[in-house]
Amino acid sequence: MSKTRAVIPGSFDPITYGHLDIIERSADRFDEIHVCVLKNSSKGGTFDSEERMTLIEESVKHLPNIQVHHFNGLLVDFCDQVGAKTIIRGLRAVSDFEYELRLTSMNKKLNSNIETMYMMTSANYSFISSSIVKEVAAYQADISPFVPPHVERALKKKFNV
C-alpha cells in the first residue's frame, strides 16, 4: 500500500500554536506531512525562508512524519514533486473560507488530481494569526500563549526586545 502524503502550505511568519494545532492533528491522519513555506507576494516577511524553516523544524521535532521545505512556485507543482494528493488548509473563522475557496478552485483547475482538506483550528487558537502575534511582540507584550518558546525568543531578537 502506498503512503498517504499531504502538504500543509503557509507563510509561517512565524509559526504559531494555531499552525501547530493543524500540523499535529494532520500528522495523525497521514503517513507523511510536508510543511511547505511559501512566499506570499502580498505579505512582507519578518523572517526569511530559512529562518521560518528552522523555527518550524524545532516546533515539529516531536513528530517523526513531518518534513519541512520551502518552495517558490505553484503549490500544485510542489505537491507533484513530493507525491502528495492532498493539501491541508487551516480555517480560523468563516471569514477565512471565501479566500480559501478561491485558492482551492484555482489549484483544482491547475491540477485536478489534488484535493484540499479544510481543518478548523481548535477554538482556543482561532484568534491567533502570525500578523497579530508580531504586532503584540513589537509592543513587548507577552506572546507566550501564542507561540512556542523558541519562536518567542526569535521574535524578541528580531524586534530588539
From Swiss-Prot:
Its EC number is 2.7.7.3. GO terms for molecular function: ATP binding; pantetheine-phosphate adenylyltransferase activity. Keywords: ATP-binding, Coenzyme A biosynthesis, Cytoplasm, Magnesium, Nucleotide-binding, Nucleotidyltransferase, Transferase. Coiled coil: none annotated. It comes from the Bacteria. Pathway: Cofactor biosynthesis; coenzyme A biosynthesis; CoA from (R)-pantothenate: step 4/5. Reversibly transfers an adenylyl group from ATP to 4'-phosphopantetheine, yielding dephospho-CoA (dPCoA) and pyrophosphate. Pfam families: CTP_transf_like (PF01467). GO terms for biological process: coenzyme A biosynthetic process. ATP binds at S11, F12, H19, G90, L91, R92, E100, Y125, S126, F127, I128, S129, S130, S131. Its cofactor is Mg(2+). This is Phosphopantetheine adenylyltransferase. The keyword tRNA-binding does not apply. Homohexamer. SUPFAM superfamilies: Nucleotidylyl transferase. NCBIfam families: coaD_prev_kdtB, cyt_tran_rel. It is found in: Cytoplasm. Belongs to the bacterial CoaD family. The keyword Magnesium applies. One of its GO terms (cellular component) is cytoplasm.
